[in-house]
Amino acid sequence: MANTASAIKAAEVALDKGDYNLCIQIIEPLLLSFSERTSIGGQIRLLIVTAYIGIGDEKKAIDICHTLINNKESSIHQQAKQLLSILDAPS
């Protein structure tokens, strides 16, 4: 769990610096370890959604947000719904 926490922190730092590709590299290996229905799984998916938005890959961001609608944490599924409403809005 300590490695996961340090990876999440490193991904957050990468996001803060605008290094979206590094964030994706850090988070992708964790996706298989944590279900989208768990708190940590939701948290890491929200991070990678933000990174995908940052690099302009809205399709991947939308696909992941759809998986988070069923997360057990209301804050995570609410954030996913908010992001979907923004991503699905006409431009």
Q: What residue spans do the PLM features occupy?
A:
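N-terminal intrinsically disordered, acidic low-complexity segments at the extreme N-terminus
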Residues: 66-91
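Solenoid-like repeat scaffolds
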Residues: 29-37, 69-72
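"A position-specific structural signal for the A-helix of alpha-solenoid helical repeats
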Residues: 9, 45-50, 82-83
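Alpha-helical linker/edge segments of TPR/alpha-solenoid repeat scaffolds
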Residues: 49-60, 86-91
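Alpha-helical segment of the N-proximal tetratricopeptide repeat
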Residues: 3-29
